[in-house]
UniProtKB/Swiss-Prot annotation:
InterPro entries: VerF-like, Znf_C2H2_sf, Znf_C2H2_type. Disruption phenotype: Shows remarkable defects in conidial yield (40% decrease) and virulence (25% decrease). Decreases tolerances to hyperosmolarity, oxidation, carbendazim, cell wall perturbing and high temperature at 34 degrees Celsius. Significantly reduces the resistance of conidia to oxidation, hyperosmolarity, wet-heat stress at 45 degrees Celsius and UV-B irradiation. Leads the repression of conidiation- and virulence-associated genes and affects also expression of stress-responsive effector genes and cellular signaling factors. The keyword Transport does not apply. PANTHER family: MIP31509P (PTHR40626), RESPIRATION FACTOR 2-RELATED (PTHR40626:SF13). It comes from Metarhizium robertsii (strain ARSEF 23 / ATCC MYA-3075). Disulfide bonds: none annotated. It is found in: Nucleus; Cytoplasm. The gene is MSN2. A zinc finger (C2H2-type) spans 409-432, 438-460. This is C2H2-type transcription factor MSN2.
Length: 530
C-alpha cells in the first residue's frame, strides 16, 4: 500500500510545489533582506521604506523540503514578470510622501526650475523705471504657465486699480500679457483640501510658501465676466496707457521720414568723382604720364586756366582756331597737340606753327629749297597755311615734354627747359634774338643753327660751304677728288663755327638732331607743304 501511495504523494507534492513555487521563491527573498535599500531617501521624508514585492501574499506557507528535481517542469515561464514582482513598485505621485520631488518640510530648493518661485518678485534692487514700463510685458507670472490649464479664478474687486492708481501700483499686481492662457497657479497651491490628485508643480514647492504670492496671481485682468464694466474699462485704460503710450514729443523729435538735404546737392557727390575725372588722352605717351609740373597733360582741367599768366609767354593759337571743326573730339585733340607744340623742345620742324614762328618756317623753306624758289617759299610763309593734323601728331621720343624736371637749363623768356646748354642757346637764337651767325660761303645765306647750314650746304654740288683751309699743307693732291681747295680766308673767327658744324655732322655728337635726321624730316615736311 505504501508502494501504491508513494506515487500519489509524489504527484501531490509535485502539483503543490508547482503551485507554490513562486511563493517559495518569494519567501526566500523576503527572509533575506538587502543590505541597503534600493531607493535611498532622506530621513526627513516621513515615509516608509519601499517594499520589494508589494504584490506578494501576506502569509506565506512554508514547505518542508524542496521538491524533487526530476518532477520540475522543463520550461519555466515567469508569468509574473509583467506585474513587476521582481522590481520595486513605482512610488505613487502623492503629496504626502514622494520620492520624486523635494520633501514638504525642506525649505531651500536645490535647483529652482521655475522662475516664478525663485523669490525675485519682491526684489528691491530692480529699478522702478524698468518696473513700470516692462512689468506688463515681461512678468514672472507669465513665464512658465501651462497654456490651457482649466483654472477658475475668483474676482477680487478690491484689487482692481482705478484711474488714480499709478503705474507702480499696477506693477505690484503683476498682470501678465493679454494672452488666452490663464494664471499659472492651480487650485492645489491655493487650497489645502485638494490632496486627491498630484500636481506636478506641487512637487517643487516648499510647504511654507510665501503668502504674498497667492493674492498676486488671482488676477482680474484676463477679461472675466464677473467684474463690472466700469472697472474693466478703467483697467483697460491704465493698461493701454502703460504699454502703448508713445509721447508725441518723441515722435516729433525723431523725423524718420524727413528728406535728407545733404545728398540733394550735386557738389557733394561730385567731389567724390573728381579724382577719377582726369582721363588721359589716347595719344598720350608714357613720358607725358610721368611728367610733373604745371604742364602736365593728364587731365582736361589743365586747359581751364589762363596760359599767359602761368607760362609767361603768349601761347600760339592752335590750328583748330583757324577753321571751325564740327567734331568735338577732333577739336579737343587738335587743341591738345597745339599746346604741346607750343611747349616742345624742338619747334623747328613744325610747319603748322603760329605767327611767332614764321621766321623759323622761312629758314626751313630756304634751306630745303634751291635759291630760285626763295620767293615762292617766303610767299607760303606769309600766307596762313591750312591746318595739317598729321605733322602735329608725329612726335618722336626725343621730342618729349618740356616740363621734365631732369632738364636743368631753363629759358628766361619762355620758361622752356633743356637738357643741354647748346640746346638752350640754339633755342634762344632761333626764337628770341633771331640771330643768324652761320652763313653760307657760296650764296651768302645766313642761318641761326649749324645743322640748318649743314643741310643747306648739301644743296651745293661743289661743297664750297665747308671751309677746309685749316690744314697748313695746301697741296691739292692731299684732298679727295671731289674736294677743291677753297680760297684763303682771312677771317679766322669762322674756324670755330666750322669745327662746330663738323662736330654736328658726327652721328654721336652732342647735338640732338644730326644733319641726316634734319634733312629727312625737312624733305618729308617740304613735300607735304607743297
Amino acid at each position: 500500500m505504501d508502494s501504491n501511495m508513494m506515487p500519489q504523494t509524489a504527484q501531490q507534492n509535485a502539483v503543490f510545489s508547482k503551485t507554490n513555487f513562486a511563493q517559495q521563491k518569494l519567501g526566500q527573498y523576503q527572509v533575506v533582506a538587502p543590505a541597503s535599500p534600493v531607493c535611498s531617501r532622506p530621513g526627513s521624508s516621513c515615509s516608509q521604506p519601499p517594499t520589494l514585492f508589494s504584490n506578494g501574499p501576506a502569509v506565506l506557507t512554508p514547505t518542508g523540503s524542496p521538491p524533487p528535481i526530476g518532477f520540475r517542469p522543463a520550461v519555466m515561464l515567469e508569468s509574473e514578470f509583467g506585474d513587476s514582482s521582481y522590481f520595486p513598485s513605482t512610488p505613487p505621485l502623492s503629496t504626502s510622501g514622494s520620492a520624486v520631488g523635494s520633501p514638504k518640510n525642506y525649505e531651500v530648493l536645490q535647483t529652482p526650475l521655475n522662475p516664478m518661485f525663485s523669490g525675485l518678485d519682491g526684489f528691491v534692487g530692480v529699478k522702478s523705471g524698468y518696473e513700470s514700463t516692462e512689468s506688463s510685458v515681461l512678468d514672472w507670472a507669465s513665464c512658465d504657465s501651462p497654456p490651457m490649464t482649466p483654472v477658475f479664478i475668483h474676482s477680487q474687486p478690491s484689487r482692481v486699480p482705478s484711474l488714480s492708481s499709478t503705474t507702480s501700483d499696477l506693477s505690484n499686481i503683476s498682470c501678465p500679457s493679454l494672452s488666452p492662457s490663464p494664471a499659472p497657479y492651480a487650485r492645489s497651491v491655493s487650497s489645502e483640501n485638494d490632496v486627491d490628485f498630484c500636481d506636478p508643480r506641487n512637487l517643487t514647492v516648499p510647504n511654507t510658501s510665501n503668502s504674498s504670492l497667492a493674492p498676486e496671481f488671482t488676477l482680474d485682468c484676463l477679461g472675466e465676466e464677473e467684474g463690472s464694466p466700469s472697472e474693466q474699462s478703467a483697467l483697460d485704460t491704465v493698461l493701454s496707457q502703460t504699454a502703448f503710450d508713445f509721447s508725441p514729443a518723441i515722435a516729433s523729435g525723431l523725423p524718420a521720414f524727413e528728406e535728407l538735404s545733404d545728398f540733394e546737392s550735386e557738389d557733394d557727390l561730385s567731389n567724390l568723382v573728381k579724382p577719377g575725372e582726369g582721363s588721359r588722352p589716347r595719344a598720350c605717351t608714357g613720358s607725358s604720364i610721368v611728367s610733373l609740373g604745371h604742364g602736365s597733360f593728364i587731365a582736361d582741367e589743365d586747359f581751364s586756366f589762363d596760359e599767359n599768366d602761368t607760362f609767361q609767354f603768349p601761347s600760339p593759337s592752335p590750328p583748330s582756331s583757324v577753321e571751325a571743326v564740327d567734331d568735338g573730339h577732333k577739336d579737343k585733340r587738335q587743341k591738345k597737340t597745339g599746346t604741346k607744340d607750343s611747349q616742345s623742345a624742338e619747334p623747328v620742324m613744325d610747319t603748322a606753327a603760329a605767327d611767332n614762328q614764321t621766321a623759323e618756317v622761312e629758314e626751313q623753306s630756304e634751306q630745303a629749297s634751291p635759291v630760285p624758289s626763295e620767293s615762292h617759299s617766303s610767299a607760303e610763309a606769309d600766307t596762313p597755311s591750312a591746318p595739317l593734323p598729321a605733322p602735329t601728331n608725329r612726335r618722336g621720343r626725343k621730342q618729349s615734354l618740356t616740363e621734365d624736371p631732369s632738364k636743368t637749363f631753363v629759358c628766361d623768356l619762355c620758361n622752356r627747359r633743356f637738357r643741354r646748354q647748346e640746346h638752350l642757346k640754339r633755342h634762344y637764337r632761333s626764337l628770341h634774338t633771331q640771330e643768324k651767325p652761320f652763313e653760307c660761303n657760296e650764296c651768302g645765306k645766313k642761318f641761326s643753327r649749324s645743322d640748318n647750314l649743314a643741310q643747306h650746304a648739301r644743296t651745293h654740288a661743289s661743297g664750297g660751304a665747308i671751309v677746309m683751309n685749316i690744314i697748313d699743307n695746301a697741296d691739292p693732291s692731299a684732298y679727295e677728288a671731289g674736294m677743291v681747295a677753297p680760297p684763303p680766308v682771312d677771317d679766322y673767327a669762322n674756324y670755330g663755327k666750322v669745327l662746330f658744324q663738323i662736330a654736328a655732322d658726327v652721328p654721336g655728337s652732342a647735338s640732338e638732331l644730326s644733319s641726316e635726321e634734319a634733312s629727312d624730316n625737312g624733305k618729308k615736311k617740304r613735300k607735304r607743304s607743297e
